[in-house]
Amino acid sequence: MNLEEENTIFKPLYSLKHSPINAYFSKNSDDFVVRERPLYEFSGKGEHLILHINKKDLTTNEALKILSETSGVKIRDFGYAGLKDKQGSTFQYLSMPKKFESFLSNFSHPKLKILEIFTHENKLRIGHLKGNTFFIRLKKVLPSDALKLEQALMNLDKQGFTNYFGYQRFGKFGDNYKEGLEILHGKKMKNVKMKEFLISAFQSELFNRYLSKRVELSHFANDFSEKELIQIYKISKEEAKELKKQEQFFKLLKGEVLGHYPFGKCFLCEDLSAELGRFKARDISAMGLLIGAKAYETGEGLALNLENEIFKDTLEFKAKMQGSRRFMWGYLEELKWRYDEEKAHFCIEFFLQKGSYATVVLEEILHKNLFE
């Protein structure tokens, strides 16, 4: 696998099998709304202000710059739980030193509003959120397509979704992972944050490719015979039987890394039959590799073989990255939808755990690449 020479953008496989659904989606402030859900309640005391803001068509960094220019707080002294995209309307939380509170009394900006102010002991850090609630409005939806959307949503609600990294991770042209690979090869870059982002994009690209390979395996396990699975994956008859026996779409493998869902430690899948029950109950999920020296190692068998197919040519860079694990399979929570036939609008709302992308869910539903 020669990533440097690839000229096309890799397109991960979908878990659902329906044909593409016609709908118009624009990531504007009326049709795409994100609401952060904090990880904890704010105490009401301490040396930090927590600002609940609503930004429209601004990145988080652009919002911080506006607040910095108004309050005099250095950008590095602000805290946030997650970086949000420019497009759409976002309700999120930021922290800043309380001593600058007076500078906010007359704050006014057409794209940025301060809705509430709390106090707390700690500065907000990346990851200090439970997840995000999303509102998406699709337009120009015919009744026949609305029925297809409903069926796709019911299927995802029942089975879960592929927790790919979204197109936002990979830059304007979808290939900034190549720059990350160049840095790992020795290319110099002074901007430390950009350097880290590009290397992260490289890790994310490999994660997506491995997850896509697991989706392919799951489709094959559902559609092919034991004999065919043995021929394709060079596995034993017993392993093929185990795959065919699993009723859920995403197939677990003995020896792979699992994690307690949605927050929890990693462990190896040693007793497959026991872990399948916990997986179906959504207590655990499979964890894909973000390559690096400190990532939890896969055990053995087909899980390791499939992983090696993706990562074998990049092992020389392993020591240059910290590495970790990420859930490959996630679940929609608090899902609801409504269809307005007169306006031809189809509205969807759901909650995702932190780190998951609403655009990935939308691409799965529509079977369209939003990047294009």
Curated annotation (Swiss-Prot):
It is an enzyme of class 5 (isomerase). Its EC number is 5.4.99.27. Residues 160-330 form the TRUD domain. One of its GO terms (cellular component) is cytosol. It catalyses: uridine(13) in tRNA = pseudouridine(13) in tRNA. Pfam families: TruD (PF01142). The active site is at 85 (nucleophile). Keywords: Isomerase, tRNA processing. InterPro entries: PsdUridine_synth_cat_dom_sf, PsdUridine_synth_TruD, PsdUridine_synth_TruD_CS, PsdUridine_synth_TruD_insert, TruD_catalytic, TruD_pseudoU_synthase. One of its GO terms (molecular function) is tRNA pseudouridine(13) synthase activity. GO terms for biological process: tRNA pseudouridine synthesis. It comes from the Bacteria. Responsible for synthesis of pseudouridine from uracil-13 in transfer RNAs. Belongs to the pseudouridine synthase TruD family. This is tRNA pseudouridine synthase D. The gene is truD.
